[in-house]
Every structure is written in structure tokens, then in C-alpha cells.
Amino acid sequence: MELLALRWVLLAGTLLSTSAASSALQEGDLGSITVIMDMALNSFDDQYLLCEDRMRARLQMENITEFSTNIAYAVTWRQAAAEWQKRWGHLARPMQLIREQAIALLAYSASSRMCTLFNEATRQGGRSHQDYIHSYHFKTLHFFLTQALFALRASQPRCYYVYRGVRGIRFMTQRGKSVRFGQFTSTSLRKEATVNFGQDTLFVVKTCYGVPIKQFSFFPSEDEVLIPPFEVFEVINFSNDRGSVKIQLHSKGKMSTHNCELLKPQGGQWGRGHQEVGLGLSPGLSLPVLPCRRRVWEGLGHREGDPIPAAV
């Protein structure tokens, strides 16, 4: 009898230990992967320096083609255009941004589905000239987002301390390393706002080329700051405490390997673009796409009870 009682005690202890271990594993997110940060050299990082007017003229036809091949992009852009019309369509004075720039920011903030497709394409769109011309179907969005960030920064040039939580990826790096996100990256001025977007990695970032887009977002409460793909950061600090990664980055300039790519002759070789920091560039594996911040509302549908922007 005593032996039976002892077995029950041991079994109960085993079950409790298993339950505790299971809970701890859930908190650590078993689905997370480990990724080493790099300079994202496959990224399409065009800054369109000295070719803005020619790009606008060329993109008038490109946008029609892109809409026909990318339904998520087309639907989200139309919804963003409707929201622009509602907010600013009847203003008598010029806006801080031109219409297309404001719509691009609204579209980026509206749908995590389109954002994910866009970021995936942007991180690989710089592999070759042919890939960009024939396979990168976000040329218009990339151009107007880039121009919007430059315009907003010109009106208030300063640096911001921002935060970004990530679910599903534990990024690895080392102090002193130069890195880029290689995509348009959403961050927040409020640390508490990052918790809902994941805790496997926390980025604490000093950005000098990212700008607040609260005025041009479907979700102004997030206090979003959008960082461009060409900004270069130095890793100031890195820690990995029981599976929770914290990375501190400081802006050290900007670097693009491509410029005005759409205007180059077909079959032309890519030349090095605009560079403002001295970096030793070496080809390497491309960093997987940083997940888009989850949006409560999705541009291609919604869940019952979720708020939907009034323009839809």
C-alpha cells in the first residue's frame, strides 16, 4: 500500500513538472527561429536621387500593370485612396505630402497581408536588374513611400528612439556590427505598444531616417515610425536572456546599392548607388523578412467585431 502511495506521489510530481515545463516552453514560443542579422544586400533599396520627376512619369503606366497582377495591392491601394479623399480631398491648401505619397503611407499601414507581400518582394527585389524589372510588382508603392519619408523628414529633420517587438524570430548579432532591415520597417514611439507584436525579439532603435506617420495611418494610436530599407545601423548592445532577445541599434547613415533602377537600359548592369557610410560589403545570405505588425483590420476582409476604417 505504501508502495502504491509512493507511486502516486511520483506520478503527480512528474505531471506537475511536465505542466510547468510545457508552460515555460509556450512562453518561449516553440515556433521561433533564429536568424543572424546582416546588411540585407539583396534588398531593393533605391532612393531615387535626382530622378524623381522622370520616375513619376514612368510609373503612371507601371501602376496599372501592377494592379492587374496583385489583387491584395490593388484593393488596399483603392481603400487607401478612398480614405485620402475622405480626410483631405476637399482641402483648399496643399498638404504636406502629395496625394500619392499620402496614399502610399495609408496603404502600408492598412493591411498586414499586403505589407507582408511587399516586404518579401522588397527584401529580394535587389538580386538583379531582371528580377526588379519583371518580378518586383511594387515599384509604385516603393517609390512613393520613399518619397513620402524624405518629404516628412525634410520638414522636421531629427532622430527618434523607437521600439519594435517581433514574434517568431530571434535575431542574432554582435556589438559593433553594421546591419540594415532591408525593408520598410514599422516601429513605435511607445515601448508598451510593441508587446502585442511579439516578444521573441525586442528592438530598441535610434533612427535618423525613419519618420512618424501617425497622421497618415489607419491606426494612429500605434504612434508608428516607419524606417526605410536603406538606413544603416550599428549594433550598440545585444542580449539573449532565456530566449528573449534584446537588440539596441543606433543609426550610422544610409546606404543604397541601386538608384533610379527603373530608368536604366534593359540588360544594363547594376552600379553601386548612393552611399554615405563606409562599409565593407560582402555577399551573404539574405535576412528573412521581418514580420509585419499585426493589424486589427485587414484590407481584404475583417473578423466579426473588428473596427473597419470608415472609408471602406
Curated annotation (Swiss-Prot):
Q: What does the record give as the active site? A: 164, 186, 224
Keyword ATP-binding: yes or no?
no
Domain TR mART core, which positions? 71-256
What keywords appear on the UniProt entry?
Disulfide bond, Glycosyltransferase, NAD, NADP, Nucleotidyltransferase, Secreted, Signal, Transferase, Zymogen
Q: Which reaction does it catalyse?
A: L-arginyl-[protein] + NAD(+) = N(omega)-(ADP-D-ribosyl)-L-arginyl-[protein] + nicotinamide + H(+)
Give the propeptide segment as residue ranges.
21-31, 267-312
GO biological process per UniProt: response to antibiotic
**Cell compartments where the protein resides:** Secreted, Extracellular space
Q: Which residues form the signal peptide?
A: 1-20
* Enzyme class, broadest EC rank: transferase
- Known EC number(s)? 2.4.2.31
Please give the Gene Ontology molecular function terms for this protein: NAD+ poly-ADP-ribosyltransferase activity; NAD+-protein-arginine ADP-ribosyltransferase activity; nucleotidyltransferase activity
Query: What family, per the record?
Result: Belongs to the Arg-specific ADP-ribosyltransferase family.
Disulfide links within the chain: 51-260, 159-208
What cellular component terms from Gene Ontology apply here?
cytolytic granule; extracellular space
Protein name, entry field: NAD(P)(+)--arginine ADP-ribosyltransferase 1
Taxonomically, what lineage is the organism? Eukaryota, Metazoa, Chordata, Craniata, Vertebrata
The record lists NAD(+) as bound by 108, 164, 183, 217
Q: Does the keyword Glycosyltransferase apply?
A: yes
